[in-house]
Amino acid sequence: MFPATVQFWDTSLEPKQAVELALRRSARMQCERGHPKGRMVTLGVMSTPSPEFSALSAPLTRSRAHTRAGIRACVDRAIANGSLAAGLDAAALTCVFDSFMLGLSTLARDGKTFKAMDAAITQLMHLWDMHAR
């Protein structure tokens, strides 16, 4: 399991807090000195583009699916506990946060700072608030 995403499964955290914490930890890790720029789970798919290499990319695919499932679990928990609206499109909101998280690695690779990513995460979390009850 990717260390920055373990909080998705921590039910002692509020769902929004878990998602926000995962995003901020991932962004911070991407920008740490000595850490390769860009997340292997995201960018590793670029080195295995054809079907004959699918066995090589399978662990990366599973890791991304696990992260996506964690985000979805948080969204579903928030709907169940009433902190997000019941009619919310949970799949779409999950896709938004998953896409953003995957994009952090590209931003890091392109030299964006943690400060810039952190500010973007703050803006993204307003989307969660827009759907709060």
Predicted regions and their residues:
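Structural signal for well-ordered, non-membrane alpha-helices
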Residues: 2, 6, 20, 27, ...
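Hydrophobic alpha-helical connector segments
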Residues: 5-38, 90-97
